[in-house]
């Protein structure tokens, strides 16, 4: 399925919900989506309520 990337292991996509980037500060963790080898950005990053 994939060659390399934070959401790829042994040529397979990691399952949806696997943490691929640990949160820093007020940011939230980023998670694999099960469809890409890249680590998609969390849409809620850096937004304060």
Swiss-Prot record:
Chief place where the protein resides: secreted
TM region(s), chain numbering: none
Disulfide bond sites: 2-11, 7-32, 8-37, 20-39
Motif Cell attachment site: positions: 24-26
InterPro entries the record matches: Disintegrin_CS, Disintegrin_dom, Disintegrin_dom_sf
GO MF terms, alphabetically ordered: toxin activity
Sequence ranges assigned to domain Disintegrin in this UniProt record: 1-47
Domain of life: Eukaryota
Keyword annotations of the record: Cell adhesion impairing toxin, Disulfide bond, Hemostasis impairing toxin, Platelet aggregation inhibiting toxin, Secreted, Toxin
Tissue expression pattern: Expressed by the venom gland.
Annotated SMART domains: DISIN (SM00050)
Location of the protein in the cell: Secreted
Single GO cellular component term: extracellular region
Quaternary data: Monomer (disintegrin).
Other notes: The disintegrin belongs to the short disintegrin subfamily.
Family of the protein in this entry: Belongs to the venom metalloproteinase (M12B) family. P-II subfamily. P-IIa sub-subfamily.
Record function comment: Inhibits ADP-induced human platelet aggregation.
The protein's name in its UniProt record: Disintegrin leucogastin-B
């Amino acid at each position: 399925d994939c060659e390399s990337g934070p959401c790829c292991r042994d040529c397979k996509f990691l399952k949806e919900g696997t943490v691929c980037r640990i949160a820093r500060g007020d940011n939230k963790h980023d998670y694999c989506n099960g469809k890409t080898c890249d680590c998609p950005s969390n849409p809620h990053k850096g937004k304060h309520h």
